[in-house]
Amino acid sequence: HDSLIEVAGVVKAVSALPEIVRVYEESGVKFIATSRVSQLRIMREAGLTQKPLMLIRIPMLSELPDVVALSDISLQSDITVLRALNEEAKRQNKIHEVILMMDLGDLREGFWNEEDALDAALEVENKLKNLRLAGVGVNLSCYGSVVPTKRNMQALVSLAADIEREIGRQLDYVSGGASTSAYMALNGTMPYRINLLRFGEIGLLGESDNFSPDFLHKDVLTIKAEVI
């Protein structure tokens, strides 16, 4: 892959253990990411803020005060939540960044059709002044076991291009999935415009599903427990 792909280091599997978060910070990841608001709080309170903190799921409405206070950027796929998030960011006098998610068959999250995603992008860009549209993304290999392919990655790239044409500027990020997208990035089949991946499993365990690169260590974590 000839372009730079940034990494969001996902720490939910280790409960945002400060020692591991610090390693991620030092490794040069773009974001520290988790799906747990409680873990965002742990990192904030521990001063682990060298990198922007990312929430990698759509939040509940009741969580929005914490989402704005504790994270810098979040994945979003519902216009009602986006509008409420904007109001909360306004109350806290903050600009919160969002990545709009597109569902490409996995059914975990995201707008189901491109028209809805385009409408949401235009509303964020032009009307929701306390939100900043940072990019678009997709989640795969989760609920529906739809794996990353050149075809669905290109569909995401096409959506990004359509949004960029409508808003008149380039998006910062086109996020092409998580650990299961690593093989495409490493074997040169990832479309050029994909520039952010969210790595949890492959960063911690050195492998993901059936993909196990030789250059990644598989023994960096040891679980110790007392047997009763």
Residue ranges and their predicted role:
Residues 2-71, 184:
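N-terminal active-site wall of soluble small-molecule enzyme domains
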Residues 64-107:
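A generic, well-ordered mixed alpha/beta core segment in the N-terminal half of proteins
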Residues 97, 103-224:
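Active-site loop/helix belt of alpha/beta enzymes
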Residues 3-7, 28-31, 49-53, 71-72, ...:
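Short, well-ordered coil/turn segments that N-cap beta-strands
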Residues 2, 22-26, 44-49, 68-69, ...:
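Acidic (Asp/Glu)-rich catalytic clusters
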Residues 36-39, 57-62, 79-81, 102-104, ...:
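Short, acidic/turn-prone active-site loops that include or flank metal/cofactor-
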Residues 18, 40-43, 80-94, 145-155:
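Active-site-adjacent beta->alpha loops and helix N-cap segments on the catalytic face
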Residues 12, 43, 67, 78, ...:
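Conserved, mostly hydrophobic/aromatic
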